[in-house]
Amino acid sequence: MSRGRRPQQAASGYDCVVVGAGPVGLALAMAAAEEGSRVLLVDAGNLRSGKRDIPRDASFRTEITDPLRHADASLTTRRGVGGTSWLWGGRCVTLEPIDFEPRDYVPRSDWPIRLDDVTPWLEQAARYIDCGSAVFRSSRPDWDGLSEITMSNLERWARQPKLARGLGARVLAHPRVTAMLDSRLVDLEMADDGSIAGLVVERGGERTTLHGDAYVLAMGGLEVTRVLLDVQSRHPHLFGGVDGPLGRYYMGHATGSIADIVLTDAARAADLDFERDEHDTYIRRRFTLTPEAQRRHRVLNTSFYLDNPPFYEHTHRHPTLSAVFLGIAIAPIGRILLAEGIRLRHVGPRPYRVGAHVRNILRRPWQAAVDVIDILLRRYASPVRKPGFILHNAGGRYSLHYHAEQLPNPDSRVVRTVGDDGTPVLRVDYRYLEGDVDSLLRCHELLDAELQAAGLGRLEYRASDEDGVRALAWEQATDGFHSIGTTRMSARPDEGVADGDCRVHGVANLYIASTSLLPTSAEANPTFFAAALAVRLAHHLSAHARRTERTGRSDSAERSDAVGAAAD
């Protein structure tokens, strides 16, 4: 590894050039290096830049059409080693077989691959992301009486989500990895045969062209899309053409809470709390609908989990929640403890009812002190970071949080325009559909019906009628953290940007490793699965590199055939 190598010294001789040192790029670089490939890892940031907001770039700007629906880039992206893991909560969830299937009620839902194509690489991704294991099913039985609802789906949590110190350090120390940091990708050079001739990067005001056998764009979803849109502006026939799929089908998730869950037996809440498994990793069971129920009721994949009441609602009267609220409401303290996007969600809208929260603390100050110390020790002083906490109560009442799939929508998109001053603009027009909310409300109804029929509990909505509940769901419909779909996989080039091997359609040696590849959003947070796709891609590319080394051939046509046929 060499971090200090001058650009002209690091310009050629690599099996794989990876742009982006976030979770997905790091996983790809490590997997490829462990397979024997020579990897050049390029990132616009450095070892420390992920700790702060990305400085404004005079070469382009981003405009968000509806800020109520999409978070600002300062809350969702970072540059440098570790990338957006500096802001990541660490939740790891895999996709399910139904997520890959064509569903007639979900347009453009067919993937060019199936879960079985990625399963062999899940364990390796879990090792890199540090979530203990690729076991995502609980062996514990569901509660008696549940049939369309299951509790077997697990979410796992990275022991330490900020990956720069762990995976990042190992990647940079690997002898087969050369890192070029503080090097911004500015262009893709096209060869006469339509392949990539090289990547142009700028470092310290100096431009240089990097050469490798394969090039992988492993930045965040919007950044990968921006780069390809920029190239398409000069080569309109690429990536499906200017009216094609590039930038369309932008998805994330619907997430929030519109109801409380009231358990008949308050002790059952422990079944849905965080726990450490045999891998010394935190896991949590969740409510999800079985695949059969999803098909029968024609609903999108949706998960539910227990949560505390909103910290900012002083009416919870809980001293610990109020103490936590007051701590994170002080911005300099809260930003140390939480990523800013998460902090803002917990502190809620102004005005803050500080006096009411102080009175809550004074009811039982010793409980607040003991609980807060325990939370701080388990979350910030432990080698295995506890991702959250649930304060149990004798009434069995908890906030019910949802995380729901979105419908693929071609009008939810990002486009490249040019401002009046000539600066390229990435315009983000992120949208939800009424169908997203319809499915979400129906899933709540199905969960409520099963709980009541089995005598296990009930849901109590936070609005008095259906219109009010729907309005609450729309109020919370916002994302921008999960950039899915804008370079979607597809079997045909007119339906997507990349094929099932993550290779860009029509460009033999250009690949994508990003959450933007996913054609559907499922209910799963996308980071872990994108890392697994990257590990799979690394094995494909490394197999081709070994074959090329044996035969001495590396032309683009051979690469296109060889990688497409690499070991599945």
Annotated model-derived regions:
Residues M180-A191, R378-V414, L426-T520:
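A glycine-rich dinucleotide-binding beta-alpha-beta segment and adjacent secondary-structure elements
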Residues D243-L246, T255, A259-T423, G480-S483, ...:
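FAD cofactor-binding and catalytic pocket of flavoenzymes
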